[in-house]
């Protein structure tokens, strides 16, 4: 998690 968002290994953010 980063800043309350889940971030995948490619750095894309999914809410």
UniProtKB/Swiss-Prot annotation:
One of its GO terms (cellular component) is extracellular region. The keyword Methyltransferase does not apply. Its main location: secreted. It comes from the Eukaryota. Expressed by the venom gland. Transmembrane segments: none annotated. GO terms for molecular function: sodium channel regulator activity; toxin activity. It is found in: Secreted. Keywords: Ion channel impairing toxin, Neurotoxin, Secreted, Toxin, Voltage-gated sodium channel impairing toxin. Excitatory insect beta-toxins induce a spastic paralysis. They bind voltage-independently at site-4 of sodium channels (Nav) and shift the voltage of activation toward more negative potentials thereby affecting sodium channel activation and promoting spontaneous and repetitive firing. This toxin shows an evident analgesic effect on mice, but is devoid of mammalian toxicity. Belongs to the long (4 C-C) scorpion toxin superfamily. Sodium channel inhibitor family. Beta subfamily. This is Insect toxin BmK AngP1.
């Amino acid at each position: 998690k980063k800043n309350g968002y889940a971030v995948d290994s490619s750095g894309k953010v999914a809410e």
